[in-house]
From Swiss-Prot:
Annotated binding of Zn(2+) 1, by residue: 293, 295, 299, 305
Domain Pre-SET: 291-364
Protein name per UniProt: Histone-lysine N-methyltransferase SETDB2
Catalytic reaction list: N(6),N(6)-dimethyl-L-lysyl(9)-[histone H3] + S-adenosyl-L-methionine = N(6),N(6),N(6)-trimethyl-L-lysyl(9)-[histone H3] + S-adenosyl-L-homocysteine + H(+)
Any one of the GO BP annotations: cell division
Binding positions for Zn(2+) 3 per the UniProt entry: 299, 345, 351, 356
Subcellular locations according to the entry: Nucleus; Chromosome
Residues of the SET domain: 367-694
Length: 719
C-alpha cells in the first residue's frame, strides 16, 4: 500500500513541478461537464454512459463497499461529499474519459482547447494509465485453470504510436522486479498476466500467447532485461521545428522529427518503407524461394521448420561460423550477427503469421524512432524508449538502380575521373572539413570501390564523385556457391576483405561519404536516371514516370529488364561507384555477384532496372533466362538520395549500438537481401542510434575526415 501511495505522490509531484495540476483538473472538469450535459439531453453514446457509470461507481466504492447501483441519490451525494477521493479517481479514470472528448463528442470550446494541448494530454494519459493499471490488478491472485482466450483483456482500440513494451501493460499485464530468493542480490523481471499467472521468461510468454491464441501481443513486446524501463523520464527541450510523422502514415509506427537547435527542416525526399523495385519483381517466381515451411507452433523448432534449417545450413558453410547451430532469431530478437543472412518465413509458408517467431523484418519497425538535429553530425536518429538487445530497428531502403545507368548518366570517363569535380573537391576541402562529419561529411575524393578481383589482381584508379554532397555505401560480392555474406563496409582502395572458401572467393567493397550543404550555397546539378531500350531514352526523374513505375509494378508485378552491351577500355572494367545528388545526404548500397573467370571479356554488360512506357508491352515477354542473366554479374545500387526511409539518417560511430544484418524476405535470391539494423546491446531512451561505416583511416591520404562520435575508443578519423 505504501508503494502505491508513493507512486501516487510522485505522480502529483511531477505534475506540480511542471505546473500542470490546474491543467489536469480543468480537463477532468471539462470531461465531467460534457458527460453530464450529454446524459441530461440524451445524446450520450453507450460508451459515454458506461464511462460515466464507471467513474461515479468507482469513486463511490472508495468510501463504501456499497455500489452506486441500488443506492439512492441521497446516498450518492453523501458518499461523494469528500472531494479528495472523487478527484483522485477522476484523475485515475481520465485516460478512459479523454478518448470520448473528440471534436464530435464534446462542446466546441472544449474541442478547441484540447486540440491545442493535445501533446500534453497524451503525455499525461501515459502516466495515468501506468499508475491505474498497477493499482487495479496488484491484488490479483492466481487460481489454477487452463489458460484460453478468455484470460486476456480486450485489446485497446488504438495502440499505434505506443512504446511496444508498454502494450502488455495497457492490456492489464504487470511487469515486476523481484529476487528469485531471499539470498539473491540480483533483481529479475517477471510478468503477471490478467488471469494472475506468472511469466518468468520469454519461453513462458510464448507458451501463454500460444495457449490464449493472442493476436495483438507478441514476444518482442516483453522484455526481461532489468535495465529496460518502460517509462523513462528525461528532460524535454524546446522544439524549434517538429513533425509528428515524416513517413506520413506509411510505417506501422510514426517516425517523428524534432529540431531543438535551429529552424532547419529535413531535406525533401520521398519516403519509401522498403526497397523499390521489390525483389519479387526482379526474380523469376519459380526460383524465388528455395524452401518453405508449414509449422503450426510458431517456427521455433529447427527440426521441423524448413526456413530455420535454411538459415542454419547456409550459416554452417561460412568460414566465420562457429560450431554452434545458428537458427537466426530467438523469439524475434537477434542474438548475434549471421554473415550468410537470415531467411525469414515467406508468403509461401503456411505458418501462422502472428505466432511465427521467424517473421520480424517483414512486419516493419515497431520501436519509436525520431529524426533529430545533432550538435556536430547533422541529422541523426534516436530512440524514444528503452530498447532491448537484439531488437529490430529498421531497414535501409531506397531505389534499386543499375550501376551501368548511373555511370552513363554522369558521363564518367574511362578512368572514372572528372577533372572539374576533382578541382571542386580539393578547393573546398579545408573549408568543409571542420563543419562536417559522419552523416554530413563533405566531398570524399577516394576510389569508391575496387574492381572485381580475379586470379591476377590489377589496381584500378580511384573514381571521384561529381557531387560533393553524398554518402555512398557500397557492397560487392564475388559469388560463392550458396553463400551470402554480410555487407561488410570496408575501404575499397586496397583493403578489400577477401574470404577463401572451396577454391572460390568473395570480396566486400563498400564506401561512403556524406556532405552538408556548402557554406557558399553550392548545389550540384541534379542528375536524371534514364530508361533506355533500343536507343530510346526517357527521363525517369519526373514525377509522371515515377508514378508510372510504381503503378506498373503494383499492377503487373512484373518488371522488364533491357539488356545491351557496350565495349569499354580494360581500365574501365574496374567497378567504380557512381553517386547521385542530394540536397543533404546520399547513401547507396551496391551489390555485385560474379563468378571469377579466366580470360574475361572486356565487354561490360549493362542492364536497365527500371521500366518506362515503351517497356510496358514487353513485360509479358520477359523470360526466366533473361532474369537469370540480369542477376548474374550485374551491379546494383541501393540509392536513398531522393527516396528512402529513416535509415538514411543513421550516423556513424566507432562503437555503434546497431549491427547490420542481411535478411531475405521477398526472395531467397542472394542478389536482393534487405539490409536490416538490429540493436547489439541495451539502448537507453533518447540515445542516438548508430552503426559502423567500417572505413579504415589513412586509406586515402589526400583526404582526412574526422570522426565526431566521441566514444572512448574513437578511431578519430573516418578516413
Amino acid at each position: 500500500m505504501g508503494e502505491k501511495n508513493g507512486d501516487a505522490k510522485t505522480f502529483w509531484m511531477e505534475l506540480e513541478d511542471d505546473g500542470k495540476v490546474d491543467f489536469i483538473f480543468e480537463q477532468v472538469q471539462n470531461v465531467l461537464q460534457s458527460l453530464k450535459q450529454k446524459i441530461k439531453d440524451g445524446s450520450a453514446t453507450n460508451k459515454e454512459y458506461i464511462q460515466a457509470m464507471i467513474l461515479v461507481n468507482e469513486a463511490t466504492i472508495i468510501n463504501s463497499s456499497t455500489s452506486i447501483k441500488g443506492a439512492s441519490q441521497k446516498e450518492v451525494n453523501a458518499q461523494s461529499s469528500d472531494p479528495m477521493p472523487v478527484t483522485q479517481k477522476e484523475q485515475e479514470n481520465k485516460s478512459n474519459a479523454f478518448p470520448s472528448t473528440s471534436c464530435e463528442n464534446s462542446f466546441p470550446e472544449d474541442c478547441t482547447f484540447l486540440t491545442t494541448e493535445n501533446k500534453e494530454i497524451l503525455s499525461l494519459e501515459d502516466k495515468v494509465v501506468d499508475f491505474r493499471e498497477k493499482d487495479s490488478s496488484s491484488n490479483l491472485s492466481y487460481q489454477s485453470h487452463d489458460c484460453s482466450g478468455a484470460c486476456l483483456m480486450k485489446m485497446p482500440l488504438n495502440l499505434k504510436g505506443e512504446n511496444p513494451l508498454q502494450l502488455p501493460i495497457k492490456c492489464h499485464f504487470q511487469r515486476r522486479h523481484a529476487k528469485t530468493n531471499s539470498h539473491s542480490s540480483a533483481l529479475h523481471v517477471s510478468y503477471k498476466t490478467p488471469c494472475g499467472r506468472s511469466l518468468r521468461n520469454v519461453e513462458e510468454v510464448f507458451r501463454y500467447l500460444l495457449e490464449t491464441e493472442c493476436n495483438f501481443l507478441f514476444t518482442d513486446n516483453f522484455s526481461f532485461n532489468t535495465y529496460v524501463q518502460l517509462a523513462r523520464n528525461y528532460p524535454k527541450q524546446k522544439e524549434v521545428v517538429s513533425d509528428v510523422d515524416i513517413s506520413n502514415g506509411v510505417e506501422s509506427v510514426p517516425i517523428s522529427f524534432c529540431n531543438e537547435i535551429d529552424s532547419r527542416k529535413l531535406p525533401q525526399f520521398k519516403y519509401r518503407k522498403t526497397v523499390w523495385p521489390r525483389a519479387y519483381n526482379l526474380t523469376n517466381f519459380s526460383s524465388m524461394f528455395t524452401d518453405s515451411c508449414d509449422c503450426s507452433e510458431g517456427c521455433i523448432d529447427i527440426t521441423k521448420c524448413a526456413c530455420l534449417q535454411l538459415t542454419a545450413r547456409n550459416a554452417k558453410t561460412s568460414p566465420l561460423s562457429s560450431d554452434k547451430i545458428t537458427t537466426g532469431y530467438k523469439y524475434k530478437r537477434l542474438q548475434r550477427q549471421i554473415p550468410t543472412g537470415i531467411y525469414e518465413c515467406s508468403l509461401l509458408c503456411k505458418c501462422n503469421r502472428q505466432l511465427c517467431q521467424n517473421r520480424v523484418v517483414q512486419h516493419g519497425p515497431q520501436v519509436r524512432l525520431q529524426v533529430f538535429k545533432t550538435e556536430q553530425k547533422g541529422w541523426g536518429v534516436r530512440c524514444l524508449d528503452d530498447i532491448d538487445r537484439g531488437t529490430f530497428v529498421c531497414i535501409y531502403s531506397g531505389r534499386l538502380l543499375s550501376r551501368a545507368n548511373t555511370e552513363k548518366s554522369y558521363g564518367i570517363d574511362e578512368n572514372g575521373r572528372d577533372e572539374n569535380t576533382m578541382k571542386n573537391i580539393f578547393s573546398k576541402k579545408r573549408k568543409l572539413e571542420v563543419a562536417c562529419s559522419d552523416c554530413e561529411v563533405e566531398v570524399l575524393p577516394l576510389g569508391l570501390e575496387t574492381h572485381p578481383r580475379t586470379a591476377k589482381t590489377e589496381k584500378c584508379p580511384p573514381k571521384f564523385s561529381n557531387n560533393p554532397k553524398e554518402l555512398t555505401v557500397e557492397t560487392k560480392y564475388d559469388n560463392i556457391s550458396r553463400i551470402q555474406y554480410h555487407s561488410v563496409i570496408r575501404d575499397p582502395e586496397s583493403k578489400t576483405a577477401i574470404f577463401q572458401h572451396n577454391g572460390k572467393k568473395m570480396e566486400f567493397v563498400s564506401s561512403e561519404s556524406v556532405t552538408p550543404e556548402d557554406n557558399d550555397g553550392f548545389k550540384p546539378p541534379r542528375e536524371h536516371l534514364n530508361s533506355k531500350t533500343k536507343g530510346a531514352q526517357k527521363d525517369s526523374s519526373s514525377n509522371h514516370v515515377d508514378e508510372f513505375e510504381d503503378n506498373l509494378l503494383i499492377e503487373s508485378d512484373v518488371i522488364d529488364i533491357t539488356k545491351y552491351r557496350e565495349e569499354t577500355p580494360p581500365r574501365s572494367r574496374c567497378n567504380q561507384a557512381t553517386t547521385l545528388d542530394n540536397q543533404n545526404i546520399k547513401k547507396a548500397i551496391e551489390v555485385q555477384i560474379q563468378k571469377p573467370q579466366e580470360g574475361r571479356s572486356t565487354a561490360c554488360q549493362r542492364q536497365q532496372v527500371f521500366c518506362d512506357e515503351e517497356l510496358l508491352s514487353e513485360t509479358k515477354n520477359t523470360s526466366s533466362d533473361s532474369l537469370t542473366k540480369f542477376n548474374k554479374g550485374n551491379v546494383f545500387l541501393l540509392d536513398a538520395t531522393k527516396e528512402g526511409n529513416v535509415g538514411r539518417f543513421l550516423n556513424h560511430s566507432c562503437c555503434p549500438n546497431l549491427l547490420v544484418q542481411n535478411v531475405f524476405v521477398e526472395t531467397h535470391n542472394r542478389n536482393f537481401p534487405l539490409v536490416a539494423f538490429f540493436t547489439n546491446r541495451y539502448v537507453k531512451a533518447r540515445t542516438e542510434l548508430t552503426w559502423d561505416y567500417g572505413y579504415e583511416a589513412g586509406t586515402v591520404p589526400e583526404k582526412e575526415i574526422f570522426c565526431q562520435c566521441g566514444v572512448n575508443k574513437c578511431r578519430k578519423k573516418i578516413l
